[in-house]
Amino acid sequence: MFASCHCVPRGRRTMKMIHFRSSSIKSLSQEMRCTIRLLDDSEISCHIQRETKGQFLIDHICNYYSLLEKDYFGIRYVDPEKQRHWLEPNKSIFKQMKTHPPYTMCFRVKFYPHEPLKIKEELTRYLLYLQIKRDIFHGRLLCSFSDAAYLGACIVQAELGDYDPDEHPENYISEFEIFPKQSQKLERKIVEIHKNELRGQSPPVAEFNLLLKAHTLETYGVDPHPCKDSTGTTTFLGFTAAGFVVFQGNKRIHLIKWPDVCKLKFEGKTFYVIGTQKEKKAMLAFHTSTPAACKHLWKCGVENQAFYKYAKSSQIKTVSSSKIFFKGSRFRYSGKVAKEVVEASSKIQREPPEVHRANITQSRSSHSLNKQLIINMEPLQPLLSSPSEQEEELPLGEGVPLPKEENISAPLISSSPVKAAQEYEDPPSEEEDKIKEEPLTISELVYNPSASLLPTPVDDDEIDMLFDCPSRLELEREDTDSFEDLEADENAFLIAEEEELKEARRALSWSYDILTGHIRVNPLVKSFSRLLVVGLGLLLFVFPLLLLLLESGIDLSFLCEIRQTPEFEQFHYEYYCPLKEWVTGKVHRILYMLGCS
């Protein structure tokens, strides 16, 4: 039996797709509506079944766009706990979603092309442009003042075309919400570049120039994950074409290139990156707010490493976030790698498809322009008609200082848009001189990456609350107890301690009676107890012996293999070395006291 699958973006266009389904009555009763929001904020809808896999939705959208370079894109959704996920193509959609239908997802760029020059078709470049525009608006793209002005001018040129004094009033840039917060100085610079440098550029050319500039920035392609490092400092982790990156504030403090990343793993809320830095093995540990966030971070890392690192998809292996004694989560990236995608793009020989750009030039009102740009938000739950829907909001807190212009390296080519922009600097006024003396903040540019990850943007104070534990809150509580309360608490503690000692004595006497035969127990229980005691005894003997062999310099093949595993390195550096130092210190102290006596 065949059934049609409709795709209706805002009631403007209609498309039909044919999807084979079983003719059973049960499958007919399990149809579920799914809505996907696209990068231009239009929507398409279709009906799926319980067994429909994620690849069907990806193909559905790519057929709607007539998109061939589809491996850069993915579908994202948010679960009821507000944790974001990428839809896995080889798994059932129904099993991945943790909410009841109808489902709402969004179509986004998943892997940012390392070199936009190698994108073959204009359609793919336009979709990437829409994603970069969203990244700029949500504060995910960190850049200098001159770069921000040029990026903003490219957006204005692509959306409005050439500057026309009859159509564009004096404050026409203020109608565009390009950045979360933008100063008048930044708007004046955007106007200047739009008037003088971008005239004559068609929308595809302006969009392409934006991609060329954006891909040179450090935070290009970074989807920041908020974490805490070992010192409790808020950091943001990300994955780019270059490798694994760590940001604190506006500074990149770590970059481990993909060939140097040995293993990515997670345990509970802790994410580990084991790699090579300065020819030495290092392990970085970061703490997330929930185990689900940690697993999502790990899967994103595994997918990005596979996409950017390997030459062929056949080289990709199933990875396991293994623990020392138990098997952890297993995951394998099943798509193409970057080199295969570029090679496939170079072989495209068809007539380029028509690109339908979102038309925002019909209305010049501030409300309509802002609505068109501000509506770029991540969908969480079903449609707007659903009261449970939540969307991203603008960053509310103050941003972090950004690098000054003189600290930004000069462009490599003379025709660089940024270099041309610097030649047209405004004559310094008193207001601008005052601004230049201070580091750029959220009033001019923004890097508030937490807004891109959590549905409701949070600042450092709120992130701290995510990581607060009851013990920490107890320590921070004001000491307002009276002396009588403290004395009563001490007496209660002593009574509880005596009760625990009595229980321990009773347990020891009961165990002694069982071992000596004074108390009869089931023979099966007695055999199991003896087996348990023997097993524990062997473990207490074998484990120290194995540890002694591993820590010695004995060069045996199986010992060398165990020493090179990330799990043993973690045990060595986090447990064995601190314990060894503590025992050594105690022994030295005892020997010193004996020598003095």
UniProtKB/Swiss-Prot annotation:
Write out the GO cellular component annotations: cytoskeleton; membrane
User: Where exactly are the transmembrane stretches of this chain?
Assistant: 531-551
Main subcellular location = membrane
Q: Which InterPro entries match?
A: Band_41_domain (IPR019749), Ez/rad/moesin-like (IPR000798), FA (IPR014847), FERM/acyl-CoA-bd_prot_sf (IPR014352), FERM_2 (IPR035963), FERM_central (IPR019748), FERM_CS (IPR019747), FERM_domain (IPR000299)
The entry lists its GO molecular-function terms as:
cytoskeletal protein binding
UniProt keywords (A-Z) are: Membrane, Transmembrane, Transmembrane helix
The name this protein goes by in its record? FERM domain-containing protein 3
Give the originating organism.
Pongo abelii (Sumatran orangutan)
